[in-house]
């Protein structure tokens, strides 16, 4: 025979300020458990009576059959044990139920006290809320009056803002027109300066080309003169050599014809002729060297003069170009400074106007 065990509820310390919803749930749990215990006790009692009926019927059968004392005693002992177990279980269940009833009483007392404190608090809260509602009504009336005055002020400020916005838009348009005019002037001045720079570059390049062609022509002329002088010197040298050879041949013929003459006279004549020839060669060499040196000096002098003239012309051209560039750069810089100053002034005026327009907006 198996007995049903009843679950007991653990003891918990219940505080006086317990929430009403939790107390109600605990009461419902206790009632459910009491019903469960009643059902189990009823089932156990029914089971005990059924066992008793079985024992009585078995004893009657054994008495009818005879010799069943021992078996009857065993059934009685088992029945007594079951009854004692049932009684013990019932005692335990009764104790548990008593404890649960005490806990329920404590919980109900705590819930009642909590409800009383809640009622007191609600009453005090209601009085406080009524005072707050009265204060809120007064503040709402005051705020409505302030809202009306602020709304009127906002409408007035909105009108002023629209008027100031129109004025600012017109001023911005005027400033934009002035800025566009200034930019167009700047573009025109820059284009004029660029055209001037291009013209000055072209003029300087043209002058440099002219100087280059002039220098090349002078160099070619000097080279032609040097070549002509060299060819003339070679021709003179060849002519003198031919004349000397002709004279030597003539002297050799004379010597052959006058072979019978005195050898001393011939030797004297030959020595005189050789001396004359030496003198003629020396004089020709001197003349050639004298002519070559002044020609070379003349050529070198002309080349140095041309070089000096070229360097002076180049220096003058560079000075003119640099002066033109510096004047152009100075004019561009001054124009840029003037434009930057004017744009800065216009920007400052616009910022001041925008700040003046933003002040009423921030106040709104």
From Swiss-Prot:
GO terms for molecular function: molecular condensate scaffold activity. The keyword Coiled coil applies. GO terms for cellular component: cytoplasm; glutamatergic synapse; postsynaptic density; postsynaptic density, intracellular component. Belongs to the FAM81 family. Interacts with DLG4/PSD-95, GRIN2B/GLUN2B and SYNGAP1; the interactions facilitate condensate formation. Expressed in most regions of the brain (at protein level). Keywords: Coiled coil, Cytoplasm, Synapse. The gene is Fam81a. It is found in: Postsynaptic density; Cytoplasm. Facilitates the interaction and assembly of proteins within the postsynaptic density by promoting the condensation of postsynaptic proteins via liquid-liquid phase separation. Required for neuronal activity. Accumulation at the postsynaptic density results in enlargement of dendritic spines. InterPro entries: FAM81. Residues 75-107, 158-189, 261-287 form a coiled coil. Residues 281-300 are annotated as: Disordered. This is Protein FAM81A.
């Amino acid at each position: 025979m198996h007995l049903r065990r009843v679950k007991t509820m653990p003891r918990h310390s219940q505080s006086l300020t317990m929430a009403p919803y939790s107390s109600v749930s605990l009461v419902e749990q206790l009632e459910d458990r009491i019903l469960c215990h009643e059902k189990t006790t009823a089932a156990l009692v029914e089971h005990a009576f059924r066992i008793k009926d079985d024992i009585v019927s078995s004893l009657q059968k054994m008495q009818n059959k005879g010799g069943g004392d021992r078996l009857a005693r065993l059934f009685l002992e088992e029945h007594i044990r079951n009854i004692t177990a049932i009684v013990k279980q019932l005692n335990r269940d009764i104790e548990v139920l008593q404890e649960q009833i005490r806990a329920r009483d404590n919980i109900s007392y705590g819930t009642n006290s909590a409800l009383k404190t809640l009622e007191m608090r609600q009453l005090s809260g209601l009085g406080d809320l009524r005072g707050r509602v009265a204060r809120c009504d007064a503040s709402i009336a005051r705020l409505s009056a302030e809202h009306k005055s602020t709304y009127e002020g906002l409408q007035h400020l909105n009108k002023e803002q629209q008027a100031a916005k129109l004025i600012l838009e017109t001023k911005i348009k005027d400033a934009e027109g002035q800025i566009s005019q200034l930019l167009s002037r700047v573009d025109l001045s820059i284009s004029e300066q660029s055209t001037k720079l291009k013209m000055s570059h072209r003029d300087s390049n043209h002058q440099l080309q002219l100087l280059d062609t002039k220098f090349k022509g002078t160099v070619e002329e000097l080279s032609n003169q040097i070549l002509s002088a060299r060819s003339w010197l070679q021709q003179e040298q060849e002519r003198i050599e031919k004349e000397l050879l002709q004279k030597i041949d003539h002297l050799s013929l004379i010597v052959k014809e006058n072979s019978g003459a005195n050898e001393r006279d011939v030797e004297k004549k030959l020595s005189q002729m050789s001396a004359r020839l030496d003198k003629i060669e020396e004089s020709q060499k001197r003349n050639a060297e004298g002519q070559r040196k002044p020609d070379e000096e003349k050529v070198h002098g002309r080349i140095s003069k041309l070089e000096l003239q070229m360097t002076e012309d180049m220096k003058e051209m560079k000075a003119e170009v640099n002066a033109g560039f510096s004047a152009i750069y100075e004019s561009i810089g001054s124009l840029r400074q003037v434009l930057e100053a004017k744009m800065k002034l216009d920007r400052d005026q616009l910022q001041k106007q925008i700040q003046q327009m933003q002040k009423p907006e921030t106040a709104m």
